[in-house]
Amino acid sequence: MCGIFGYLGSKLAIPVVLDGLAKLEYRGYDSAGLASIHLGDLFVRKTIGRVDELRHSLEQENIQSLLAIGHTRWATHGVPTVSNAHPHVDENRTCAVVHNGIIENFKELKSFLLSEGVSFSSDTDSEVIAQLFAYRYQTTADLIHSFSWTLSQLQGSFSCGLIHKDHPDVLLCAAQESPLILGLGEGENFIASDSRAFLKHTQSIQALASGELAIVGLGHEVETYNFALKRISKPVRQVTYTDAGSDKQGYSYYMLKEIYEQPEVLERLVHKYLDPQGHISEKFLQGFPLEDFDEISIVACGSSYHAGFLAKYIIESLVSIPVHVEVASEFRYRRAYIGQKTLAILISQSGETADTLAALKEFRRRQVSCVLGICNVEESALATGVDHCLFLEAGIEIGVASTKAFTAQLLLLILLGLKLTISKHTLSLTEHCACGKGLLELPELCNRLLANENLHSWAHTYCNEDRFIFLGRRLMYPICMEAALKLKEIAYVEANCYPAGEMKHGPIALISKGSPVITFCGDSTVYEKMVGCIMEVKARQAHVIAVASEAQEDIAAVSDFQIYVPNSHSLASPILYTIVGQIMAYTMALKKGNEIDCPRNLAKSVTVE
């Protein structure tokens, strides 16, 4: 939930680290800080708030150092204060540590160190790493062995970087079930929680696996070991992506830019996997034995869970095999049924979601024959840990509230359903191609939808409301769930979502005069049922915002505000209605004056449980 960046090379380190931290800010923005070595002593600067605050605080400093580590924080232990911000130092200010993750046994370690007379200055678990390392180093005076010993004492998931004032040409780092990427440049090296933070400097990377540490030296190769200091040979990989898209390109916010990038992302995927006749390409899951499976288990968190929930509806309707969708944080604590012919699917935009990776471990423990991943990052733990991975190819997504990555997930899952119809022989060729052609129309339909000014005007009417109810049926229900989540994430309003047919079973008690109810009516098979539900809430004097297709103009007779979506194939409609929900949340948050890209209390990549 935090961002780590480190640099050792031939340039002044602090400007490089500040730029790297700015690219990691989506991972946390409660506080920021960095540490360097200046005139033989540690230099540490920490601030509350965004990386720009840290940058501003350093404007009058002149630190001539080639080594620095930095951190941008999302608080897990200790409130956001300067003392709790990273880097953390030992009591004698000999070493500095940046840390992402949770040290589960920090209380025991802290109690031990306190009994040894060590003084602490923060409430965090992270400070234990610095204090424990310094305690060991006082005895051994051996940098590497002290680091290895310290790591052996820690329990939990973590990645960290460490520098010592007596070793200005060494940067130590380690990973345990938490991402850390090494960037290998010409006469310079980097560490970062996300490789995109250093891609403008180098595209040569190594990803630390769990239980590995690295010794980054000045002007020579990076040495990698396991925690017991057994040397590991790791290949250097050249990444194919760049940091293109990491600026706003004229848009006011990253989220808005990423909403408007969706037609391009969808076009890239449909033309990669569908031919002009709508037939799915052999390149999609080529060689993957879909015919071997008779049920599917999907595990994910947050928006990715909503994508999986839609996949359940679509796959079960297309091929009539059972699909189970699990919240990752709950999956590992229950004995969910997994058969011998179960296909496990894990969805995570970052590929580093802690609970989803824990589910991967559980699938492996239970010897599931095949695990498919869906994510956006090639070097992520999910991508490298599954048997096969479908990549979103959405480009970097910086806005914390997911937009283009989510719709890319939806499209890939819909394509998976379409591919299954071939192996399960449930659609004729004509029916199959009709579905594919409907998906090929998506980029153009998205562009038409985004040109609809009525999408933006709704917030003028409803910006003072602080509670909304979303209603949907069948394919629209998971999309309503996602729309409600978006409204919570960035507009900070209470937004509850229910299957429309459940209103009479309790939620209708929440309706009073003027209550805003948002209905997604885009599933034609249950349209009349949705109209009936609208009439029920209207009878209780609710104010109904109806989102419906252009062919459903009659919805105006029973609703107070209408947003019309271009007519589309039923498989394409969930993606179009998703974009409506994104714009509704964006315009509401904008009207309220909220922070769009970095909403309060949230982080983009949830790397702790």
Swiss-Prot record:
GO biological process, one term: fructose 6-phosphate metabolic process
MF GO annotations: carbohydrate derivative binding; glutamine-fructose-6-phosphate transaminase (isomerizing) activity
A cellular-component GO term for this protein: cytosol
rRNA-binding as UniProt keyword: no
EC id: 2.6.1.16
UniProt-listed PROSITE patterns: GATASE_TYPE_2, SIS
Subcellular location: Cytoplasm
Domain SIS: residue ranges: 280-426, 458-599
Active site: C2 (nucleophile), K604 (for fru-6p isomerization activity)
InterPro entries reported in the protein's UniProt record: GATase_2_dom (IPR017932), GFAT (IPR005855), GFAT_N (IPR047084), GlmS/AgaS_SIS (IPR035466), GlmS/FrlB_SIS (IPR035490), Ntn_hydrolases_N (IPR029055), SIS_dom (IPR001347), SIS_dom_sf (IPR046348)
Keywords annotated in UniProt: Aminotransferase, Cytoplasm, Glutamine amidotransferase, Repeat, Transferase
Domain Glutamine amidotransferase type-2, chain residue ranges per copy: 2-219
Predominant cellular place of this UniProt entry's protein: cytoplasm
Catalysis: reaction(s): D-fructose 6-phosphate + L-glutamine = D-glucosamine 6-phosphate + L-glutamate
NCBIfam families: glmS, PRK00331.1
Its biological purpose: Catalyzes the first step in hexosamine metabolism, converting fructose-6P into glucosamine-6P using glutamine as a nitrogen source.
Official protein name in the record: Glutamine--fructose-6-phosphate aminotransferase [isomerizing]
Annotated gene: glmS
